[in-house]
């Protein structure tokens, strides 16, 4: 059987364009140890003096409660009055949560339960379950 003659490879015009390089892989997200982010968040909130609740939603709640107690009469609120009320409300909530956390520590727990909040309210003498 005769051997085939060697042929030069065919040229088919331009070579195909090279594929674009793949986008650089994003570095993997850092894995923090459990509780590390929570501790950082606690430190951030302890060092800040900014309000924790947003102004507009708080103002809506205040106006809604005001409508309930004034039988539908809509009162106007000054911005400084709403700000003072929000400061007082946040200070009250923070202090209540601190007391409730102490109640949970007294029970040799780390988790804050609703019964801790109820005990803190009862020890403070806060009545009323509605609002």
UniProtKB/Swiss-Prot annotation:
Which molecular-function annotation in GO is an example for this chain?
DNA binding
Disulfide linkages recorded for this protein, renumbered to the chain, are: none
Question: Primary place of residence?
Answer: nucleus
What's any GO biological process attached to this entry?
establishment of mitotic spindle orientation
Bias regions of kind Basic residues — which residues?
A: 1-14
- Show the segment(s) annotated as H3-like: 34-131
Task: Spell out the SUPFAM superfamilies in the cross-references.
Answer: Histone-fold
Assembly and interactions? Answer: Component of centromeric nucleosomes, where DNA is wrapped around a histone octamer core. The octamer contains two molecules each of H2A, H2B, CENPA and H4 assembled in one CENPA-H4 heterotetramer and two H2A-H2B heterodimers. CENPA modulates the DNA-binding characteristics of nucleosomes so that protruding DNA ends have higher flexibility than in nucleosomes containing conventional histone H3.
The UniProt family comment states: Belongs to the histone H3 family.
Identification of the protein by name: Histone H3-like centromeric protein A
| Gene label | CENPA
